[in-house]
Amino acid sequence: TADADTQDAAEETTEAKDYGTLYVSFPTGNIRIAIDILAQQLGYFKEEGVTVEEVNLGGMDALTAINSADGNLDLLTTGFVADLQAIGSGYDLTVIGGTAVEGGAIITKKGNADQYKDAGTILNFDAVKSAKLGLQRNEAAWVITRQYLLDNGVTEDEITAIEDESTGNIAYYADQTAVAQAVQKDEVNLAFLPLEYALLYADAYDLEVVAKAGDLQENYVCCREVTSKARLAEKKDAFVAYEKARIRAFEYYKQGETDDSVRQDVVNIVASWSGKETDYVDTYLYGGVTKYATDPNTAGIVKYVEAANNSGLLQSAGIDFASYDIKQNVDTSAYGQAITELAKENPDNAFYASLLEQYNTDNQ
């Protein structure tokens, strides 16, 4: 039949594309990388002509592998503060795309949230200033909250007082569980957690969300995709193909927001890959916990670096991020080519058109 012929022709064309292999960080069980998991499991990487080898490596080990000529890793897709600290140490890193945005929460004990809220300013600044705070060091939700307070008239001196550990105004904890327990035991009044932990631990530790950090700064960047400038130059076509496949997987994920059968398929694929329970995966992907975004978002990176630097996260980094132009370490060309080509090849696709518009706005 004609359809079969078309399909055969399409398959032949697909087979003709071979842009080689990319070694990509897929940390075991980590579903923050759901878009990559989908692109792999649905065969989109292959269709676009790139072989993606999954490497169970994350954090500084991954950045070191990317930075070294003989390291067997091309791309890290989770985290961002560590990327900036590595750039400060002289690593040859460049951001080429995004994994997710937002994702932090301000929490308190059940029944206490209202006293920290304000209808006009989201947070009641006086209540926040007099509260005892708990968090894990480098927690993005605090970085964003801190910047929000500064942007709304809270002075540097007041922030310094809040962050003075010797006064007991702030306490740092080893992990997210310890932060949640500190709220439950009334060791702290307000705490900062990734949103998934705030929701996961709500019942077990009597927590409620005061505000999402994304309410304070919409679309603030978190997990970015980084490679090295050398690897990007060497494997540019493979990176473009990789980004095309990811954008297609992102579209499929978004369809799950309105189509139950797609949602179920997405959840099953990610649950099967990760070994996590389907209910947990469903909440994580579609329950308002995670906001995915494939765009590199240069504007958001610049804004986040300012906030992170103001909070002291980057002081030991080796360069002064107040004067350093982080755009030197952002290369949007692979993603830009991918979304431009997809939008051109699919002129009736409103999703691609909106991503292209977003790309043009956020990456001046």
Label each PLM-derived region with a short phrase.
Residues E53, M60-D61, A161-G168, D282-Y292, ...:
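Short linear loop/turn motifs
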Residues E11-D175, N189-L195, V209-A213, E218-N219, ...:
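Short, glycine-/small- and polar/acidic-enriched structural segments
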Residues G43, E48-G49, D70, T77-F80, ...:
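Sec/Tat-exported extracytoplasmic proteins
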Residues A34-I37, L42-G43, T64, L84, ...:
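Solvent-exposed, polar/charged alpha-helical surfaces in well-ordered, non-transmembrane soluble domains
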Residues Y172-S272:
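Pocket-lining segment of extracytoplasmic ligand-binding domains
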Residues E306-Q364:
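Conserved C-terminal helix/tail region of periplasmic/extracytoplasmic solute-binding proteins
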